C-alpha cells in the first residue's frame, strides 16, 4: 500500500532488456570502450559500487566553535559548532559527529542558524562523549547517535556469530535493558509490571559503509515491543571478516550472514524474527527472506531507506555523476557478466535482476514495512513506493526532509509510532507499554 508522491525520474532507462542486449555483445562493447578510453571510467564507476571504503572520510569542515561564555576557561566544553552548509548539515534533527579520525564522537542538536553568505551552519552540541573538540578542523556527520548500546542507555551482551567468513561481533539487547534512570521511571509509570518478553527477536542489518551502531536507533521501538534485538556485523563492514574477494554483494551474498544470525536467535529462545534493514541492509533482508533455509521464521521486514532496485539505482548515479549512459551500461556488465566481473575484483558476478525487487514483486511472501524519505537524494524513494503499489504485502510510509537513512533523526516520534504501530497490528511483540521516551541517544 503506497502513499502517493510524484517526483520526476530520468527519461532514459537502463532496462533489463538493455542490460541483456549489452551482455550479448560484451566483448565487442569492451573493445570499443577501450578504444574510446571509456573502459577505465566504467571500471572505476563499477568498483565504486562494490569496493567497500577503507575508512569513512571526515568531509565536513569545522569553521569555529561556540562557548556559553566569552571568557573561555581551561577545559570548558563548546556548546555549538559552525560547519559547512550541505544538504545533510542543513537537515533538522539530532546527529552524531565523528572527529579526530573517528576517535572523538559528539551528539549535535538542532540547527540554530544558517549563514548563506559564507555557506555555513551553526548547530548546538548536546554532548561530547569522547575526544577533545577544541582544535578540530574536520569531522563527519552521521545518523548514528550512539556508538554502542551503553551510550544509547541499554545493557547489552557481546556475542560472536560464526559467519561463513569467520567470527563476527554482535550485540544482543534483551527487553528491559534500559540503564538510564529516566527511561526506567517512564517505563515504570506507564506499565503496571514488567511484561513477559516476546519470543520474537529483531535482527538488525546496517547499510553500506556503516556499522551495527547505525541500527541502535531502533532500540527504543524494539524495547517498547518487548523484542530482544541482535545488532550484527557482516562481511566487509570493517568489523566482521572480509569475504574472499573483499567486495560488497549488494545483498546477493550478505544474506548468508543474516541466516546465521537467525540461527543464533532460534537457538537462544526465539520462535520467530523480524528483520530490520537500512539502505543496502534492506536489500540484504529481502534476499534473506527469499533464500535463507530458515526463512520460515521471518515474520516481517522493517526497512529504512532501502536499496530495492539496483538497476535503477545504478542508472540514477550514472545520471547524477554525469556519466554517459553507455559507460553506466558497461559498468553494469562489469558487475553482472562472468567475463567482465573480474575487472571489479568480484569472485562471482552479481545478478542485479535478482536484487531489483520491483521486477520481482510477485515473489514477496513476508509483510514488509518501508519507511523512506521523499527527499532522499542518494537512494531515491520511487522503487520503495512502486513496490508497495505492486505488492499487497508491502506498506510504504513516506518521510520528509530526511537525507538518506536519516528518517529517525528527523522525526524520531514518527519513526517510533510507525514501527511499533505496524508491528503491533500484526501481533508481533507485546503492545507498546509507553510512548517513546524523550531521551535523545536512542
Predicted feature descriptions by range:
Residues 1-151, 441-442:
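N-terminal targeting or regulatory segments adjacent to alpha/beta-hydrolase or S9 domains
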Residues 363-365, 370-372, 376:
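Short beta-strand/loop motif that positions the catalytic acidic residue
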Residues 402-416, 431-434, 441:
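Catalytic histidine-centered segment of alpha/beta-hydrolase-like enzymes
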Residues 222-241:
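Conserved alpha/beta-hydrolase
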Residues 247-268:
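Alpha/beta-hydrolase active-site loop
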Residues 291-351:
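Hydrolase active-site cap/lid region
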Residues 131-197:
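N-terminal cap/lid segment of alpha/beta-hydrolase-fold proteins
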Residues 366, 380-389:
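Short alpha-helix in the alpha/beta-hydrolase fold that links the catalytic acid
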Amino acid at each position: 500500500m503506497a502513499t502517493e508522491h510524484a517526483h520526476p525520474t530520468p527519461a532514459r532507462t537502463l532496462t533489463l532488456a538493455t542490460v541483456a542486449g549489452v551482455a550479448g555483445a560484451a566483448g565487442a562493447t569492451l573493445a570499443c570502450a577501450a578504444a574510446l578510453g571509456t573502459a577505465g571510467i566504467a571500471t572505476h564507476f563499477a568498483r565504486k559500487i562494490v569496493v567497500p571504503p577503507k575508512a569513512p572520510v571526515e568531509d565536513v569542515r569545522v569553521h569555529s566553535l561556540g562557548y556559553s561564555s566569552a571568557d573561555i576557561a581551561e577545559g570548558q566544553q563548546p556548546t555549538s559548532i559552525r560547519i559547512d552548509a550541505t544538504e545533510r548539515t542543513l537537515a533538522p534533527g539530532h546527529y552524531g559527529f565523528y572527529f579526530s579520525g573517528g576517535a572523538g564522537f559528539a551528539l549535535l542538536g538542532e540547527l540554530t542558524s544558517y549563514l548563506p553568505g559564507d555557506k555555513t551552519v551553526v548547530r548546538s552540541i548536546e554532548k561530547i562523549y569522547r575526544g577533545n573538540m577544541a582544535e578540530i578542523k574536520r569531522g563527519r556527520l552521521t545518523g548514528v547517535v550512539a556508538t554502542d548500546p551503553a551510550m544509547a542507555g541499554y545493557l547489552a551482551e557481546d556475542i560472536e556469530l560464526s559467519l561463513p567468513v569467520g567470527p563476527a561481533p554482535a550485540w544482543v539487547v534483551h527487553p528491559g535493558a534500559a540503564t538510564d534512570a529516566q527511561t526506567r521511571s517512564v517505563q515504570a509509570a506507564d506499565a503496571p509490571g514488567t511484561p513477559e518478553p516476546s519470543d520474537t527477536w529483531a535482527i538488525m542489518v546496517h547499510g553500506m559503509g556503516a556499522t551495527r551502531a547505525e541500527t541502535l536507533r531502533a532500540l527504543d521501538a524494539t524495547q517498547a515491543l518487548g523484542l530482544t534485538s541482535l545488532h550484527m556485523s557482516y562481511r566487509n563492514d570493517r568489523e566482521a571478516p572480509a569475504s574472499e574477494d573483499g567486495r560488497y554483494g549488494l545483498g546477493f551474498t550478505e544474506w548468508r550472514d543474516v541466516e546465521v544470525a537467525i540461527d543464533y536467535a532460534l537457538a537462544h529462545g526465539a520462535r520467530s524474527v523480524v528483520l530490520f534493514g537500512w539502505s543496502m541492509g534492506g536489500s540484504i533482508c529481502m534476499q534473506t527472506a527469499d533464500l535463507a533455509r530458515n526463512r520460515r521464521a521471518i515474520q516481517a521486514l522493517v526497512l529504512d531507506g532501502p536499496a530495492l532496485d539496483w538497476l535503477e539505482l545504478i542508472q540514477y548515479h550514472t545520471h547524477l555523476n554525469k556519466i554517459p549512459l553507455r559507460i553506466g551500461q558497461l559498468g553494469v556488465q562489469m558487475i553482472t557478466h562472468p567475463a567482465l566481473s573480474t575487472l571489479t575484483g568480484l569472485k562471482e558476478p552479481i545478478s542485479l535482476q535478482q536484487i531489483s525487487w520491483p521486477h520481482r514483486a510477485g515473489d514477496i511472501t513476508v509483510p514488509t514495512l518501508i519507511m523512506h524519505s521523499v527527499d532522499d537524494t542518494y537512494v531515491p524513494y520511487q522503487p520503495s513506493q512502486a513496490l508497495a503499489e505492486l505488492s499487497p504485502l508491502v506498506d510504504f510510509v513516506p518521510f520528509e526532509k530526511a537525507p538518506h537513512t536519516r528518517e529517525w533523526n528527523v522525526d524520531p516520534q514518527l519513526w517510533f509510532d510507525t514501527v511499533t504501530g505496524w508491528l503491533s497490528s500484526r501481533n508481533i511483540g507485546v503492545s507498546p507499554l509507553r510512548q517513546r521516551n524523550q531521551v535523545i541517544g536512542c
